Amino acid sequence: LYSQLAALARRYGAKRLVLFGSRARGDNRYNSDIDLAVYGMPEGSRSNFWMDCEDLPTLLKFDIVHITDGMNPAFLANIEKDGVTLYAAKD
């Protein structure tokens, strides 16, 4: 599943895709959602990315956050602290 998410991030032009929350920390329950932080994805691609994520073969829900300037620094620090990078574009 994570490799499919990375492929979607690449397809839709994200600079970085990070898994965060309980699944990244390893304290998730079987039905915990999948928290994703998306960096640098063009605005016009975001809804298609979300729809394609929802079409992946899982019953789990996705909570997708597109990282933008001006977001809460504490929230961003938590993502960086616990996050697992699933995709990073090569510059």
Task: Describe each PLM feature range.
Residues 1-16, 24-30, 39-91:
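Catalytic core of pol beta-like nucleotidyltransferases
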